[in-house]
Amino acid sequence: NTTENNDSYTEESSGNDYEEESNAGGGYSATGEAVVAYASQFIGNPYVYGGNSLTNGIDCSGFVQQVFAHFGYSLPRVSDAQAGAGRGISYSESRAGDIIVYSGHVAILTGDGGIVHASNSAPYPQGGIKYSSNALYRPYIAVRRIVD
């Protein structure tokens, strides 16, 4: 039994190590589409102001920070500071994986005119991570490219 458990643990551990290595290595080869795909898997999870958990509750800037951290990018924690992250671009140049910063809010552009973000408004009763189809639903301050 001990040998079987150790073998099982080793296989499990190796799988996790491989996964972590591939994620860490992805920091340099990440694509905007990969960022959006990763971010989108958390849709429906709760909004918590000041939260840092993609599964148990997070706010808008924490969401952006944690999604990019998965790919090896270190972003500031608050949206105002995220407005200076990466490289400034125009909205017309934007593509999937770029971030859009509003007054007091930040989101990840999906490339189809929409955003994925942690919001404290509908459709989820107490807000949550969601997709919104109109990135220009309110005036924005900056569009930034994190993944080149």
PLM region spans:
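Aromatic- and glycine-rich peptidoglycan recognition patches
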Residues: 26, 73, 77-90, 110-148
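A conserved glycine-rich beta-strand in the N-terminal activation segment of trypsin-fold
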Residues: 105-108
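Short, structured active-site "lid" loops
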Residues: 102
